[in-house]
From Swiss-Prot:
Residue ranges annotated as Extracellular topological domain: 119-130, 181-218, 278-301, 397-410, 467-565, 625-652
Protein name as annotated: Solute carrier organic anion transporter family member 6C1
GO cellular component: CatSper complex; motile cilium; plasma membrane
Membrane topology summary: Multi-pass membrane protein
Domain of life of the source: Eukaryota
Transmembrane spans: 95-118, 131-151, 160-180, 219-241, 254-277, 302-324, 375-396, 411-432, 446-466, 566-589, 605-624, 653-675
Name of the gene this protein is made from: Slco6c1
Biased composition (Basic and acidic residues): 7-24
Region (Disordered): 1-24
All residue ranges annotated as the Kazal-like domain in the record: 485-540
SUPFAM superfamilies: Kazal-type serine protease inhibitors, MFS general substrate transporter
GO terms of molecular function: organic anion transmembrane transporter activity
Organism: Mus musculus (Mouse)
Task performed by this protein: Auxiliary component of the CatSper complex, a complex involved in sperm cell hyperactivation.
Intervals, Cytoplasmic compartment: 1-94, 152-159, 242-253, 325-374, 433-445, 590-604, 676-706
Amino acid sequence: MAHVRNKKSDDKKAMVVAKEDTNKSESEGVTKLQTYLKTIPIAKKKFAKLPKRKKSPTSAELLLIDPRYSASKEGPLGLGPIVLPFVQRFNNIDGFMTLYVAAVLIHGALFAVVDMTLNIYQVQFSLTRTEWYLMDFSDYIASFVVAIIIAHFGSKGNRTRWIAASCILMGLESMLFAFPFFTYEIIIPGRQSIELCMEENEKRNIICGNSVPNRSKCIYFHIAGQCIHGIAGMPIYILGITFIFDHIPTSSCGFYLAIGHSAYLIGYLLGMVGGLQNFQPPPKEKTVEIEPAKVYQLLQSGWWKTFLIIAAISFCVSFMMVCFPTSLPGAHKLRLAKRKEPPTIDRRLKDMKIQPHLKGFLHNIWHILKNPLMLTQAICKVSEYLTFNTSLYFLPHHLQTQFLITPGIASLLTGAFVLPGGIIGHFLGGLIVDRLEMTNKNKLKFTLVTTVVSVGLFLLIFFVECQTTTFAGINEDYDGYGQLGNLTADCNEYCDCTTSLYTSICGRDEKEYFSPCFAGCKATKVSQTEKTYYNCSCIKEGLAASDDEGQFIDAIAGTCDSDCLKLPLFFAFYFSATVFSNMCSIPVISIILQSVPANFTSLSLGVTYAIVKFVASVPAPLLFRLSSAIACIYWDNNRCGGKERCWIYNKNILVYEFMGIWMSSQLIIVLLNIYAIQIHDVVVHGEITESKTTVKDVKEQKERKA
């Protein structure tokens, strides 16, 4: 019995131990299961029929569940299932920046080459104002239309694929621009670059308006290409910038943004250098080998080859760009680290999220526009654009009137100083912000200081001036045989000269003439690397020097020497002013990105670029056109009866217009940044409300004591 009892007790103990082991294993299993369930995203917990939390999520939770910042979006570098291990070293922000800079360079270079082809169309087709406006500004109009739409929908998906699509569009538009130069006759061969006073001038063929073959087709192709160009730029400058901002620490954003923005101007400069090569005349050996009717193909071959090269590079960049994932490795961790940084956004936007429906979308745009920090910096971006384009538009005219430089050289000098000044300004501004790790308020102060310095340097250039030379037909009446404001006089009336060719010459009488034809010159040759002119009927005074063959020289190519040595000083001041005026660009962009929540960055940039492109497409062209009309003294009236361009300006009026528009744009930046500095703490922290309450409490305490 005792043995049986002991056996039963042992069995009972064994059952208890087994039960305890079973409970222990079950508890461990539950513990493991609970630990495993905690790693499942919230979206998948619904399928486990777990109770839903009725409490509304906080802004931090909204940020974590946003699929754009989810760690699950971080993937390898590859094309779908094709993932190569040895290329994963490029799956970082530096690898993306390499391709991004290439895309921006292509966009800038294409913009420069298109501007040059527009000048060809203007000369060859005698464009009307409406045609010229549509061909020049249709890209801005297209950008204005699609900027906010691309910012809204592009931020929800894979932004690198949007940029890859932009590269494909740039390739397609390059082919559109190349097609007219490959197919149609645009550049008419045999046109004189320097016109002399000859009887043949009366017999030349004059083709006007729609009588030019394939004129309308070329214009339509150009406008279509410009529209695609404007659309292609928005994903690059909106989604690309936000992608960079999301994958770098806030303290380092200035350096990366500076590289991206400087690349656009570098691309434009490279496009100018490459496009100028196409203006060089082909060798005589090649022109002799082909038929005269096909000479235009040789003249135009450089242009369509340039466009096709750009298209090939664009397609290559798009193929590599599409391999990047939605988020680079480490993006989610970086986003969590940014949450711990001091607040910089408008406190009213703290818990907002983008609504999917139209009403909510418009409501979000309205709230962004109500953000004073974002709105002031968006207007600063507009003013920065006006400042830069004022330089590009007015500086060549100022150099022509003030320093008597020919239009071609004035345009080259403008590009040689303004574009590098903009590049250096963009890069220095971003580098200084990056190295000093400025807060938003300090960035506002930095923008204010650099703008004030640029205004001071700009004022100095107007103390640099030269004496105006005598110009026949403009401020001199051909020794009494002509009228002021009329280039035609008795001495050149029979020459039938055209004002479409502005090739100024300096006569031995120390007077400047619009062209050899208006000086009545009948012969020319190159003497000691200098073009000289002979038998000029309008030049009757002055000492005549002889050339190597004993013939008396009446005039030489170029403007008359005014003994003005102040041009280097002028460019020193102007280059410095350009650098300082562009140093505010990167701080402005970074403030726009940091003054809104992370899920609003693309939309805020979209609103900013929509404002900039609208001003660039409507008010700015009207302003520049009106100011040009007011200051113009002599227009180019073509043989078809239309005004094409202004050749000569009133010096004083042009200076006042140049100074007024440039300084007004900079002063707007100064005033807006002073205002933004004053309200920064209020917008971010809400200190005015607290201070008002404190003052009220102090008054109540004084009244109680009284």
